[in-house]
Curated annotation (Swiss-Prot):
Keyword set includes Nucleotide-binding: no
The gene coding this protein: msrA
PANTHER family according to UniProt: MITOCHONDRIAL PEPTIDE METHIONINE SULFOXIDE REDUCTASE (PTHR42799:SF2)
Organism the protein comes from: Yersinia pestis
The protein's name: Peptide methionine sulfoxide reductase MsrA
Enzymatic reactions: L-methionyl-[protein] + [thioredoxin]-disulfide + H2O = L-methionyl-(S)-S-oxide-[protein] + [thioredoxin]-dithiol; [thioredoxin]-disulfide + L-methionine + H2O = L-methionine (S)-S-oxide + [thioredoxin]-dithiol
GO biological process, any: protein modification process
Xref: Gene3D superfamilies: Peptide methionine sulphoxide reductase MsrA
Protein role: Has an important function as a repair enzyme for proteins that have been inactivated by oxidation. Catalyzes the reversible oxidation-reduction of methionine sulfoxide in proteins to methionine.
UniProt keyword terms in alphabetical order: Oxidoreductase
Active site per the UniProt annotation: 52
Length: 212
């Protein structure tokens, strides 16, 4: 098998071919009981990568105004990858949380605040002890408005880090969302099904300044 550099995202030419069939998942969210795929009228969609998706998904499903969440893969090349394939570093995907939310209750700006304040966005291709391109920090945007807000929030958080004495450069990528592929069902709402399971999520003690 070809050796893979786990500090660089693989290119499309060398990525695994994947498959045409999608990974089956439960139709209903194990916590909220809502559809895992349907987006009701008036709801919005967002995608965030914060390292291992187990803890990140729980963080978002706990927020008032979040209708449903899902763990999955995005940002890479391989269609309908398996968890094992993503962990091999040969798909280009990050572990991503899909968030369906009610903007009348929780804004995209508030979701960005949750994103920045609850992981380390300056670690490159890792998050704590989890090492590999699948653990990179990312915001995958769906609209020009989301893109603008994401970039501005990154600038504010970078300034806040510097003010706090952290001179590292944020490595979080902000790009237009590519196709999202659902992870296997045992990864969905993992920390609800396994309350004492692994969670490597943790912030750096810096708050996102308000958007003024």
């Amino acid at each position: 098998m070809q050796n893979v550099d786990n500090t660089a995202v693989i290119d499309a030419a060398n990525a695994l071919p994947g498959r045409l069939t999608s990974i089956p998942v439960s139709p209903l969210h194990a916590v909220h009981g809502h559809s895992m795929t349907y987006i009701p009228e008036g709801m919005d969609l967002a995608f965030f990568a914060m390292g291992c998706f187990w803890g990140a998904e729980r963080l978002f499903w706990q927020q008032p105004g979040v209708y449903s969440t899902a763990a999955g893969y995005s940002g890479g090349h391989t269609p309908n990858p398996t968890y094992h394939e993503v962990c091999s570093g040969r798909t280009g995907h990050a572990e991503v949380v899909r968030v369906v939310f009610d903007p009348a209750v929780i804004s995209y700006q508030q979701l960005l605040q949750i994103f920045w304040e609850n992981h380390d966005p300056a670690q490159g291709m890792r998050q704590g002890g989890d090492v590999g391109t699948q653990y990179r920090s990312a915001i995958y945007v769906l609209t020009p408005e989301q893109e603008e807000q994401a970039h501005k929030s990154r600038e504010r958080f970078q300034q806040a880090m510097e003010k706090a004495g952290d001179q590292r450069v944020i490595t979080s990528e902000i790009t237009v969302a590519l196709p999202f592929y659902y992870a296997e069902d045992d990864h969905q709402q993992y920390l609800h099904k396994n309350p004492h399971g692994y969670c490597g999520l943790g912030g750096i003690g810096v708050c996102l300044p308000p958007n003024v």
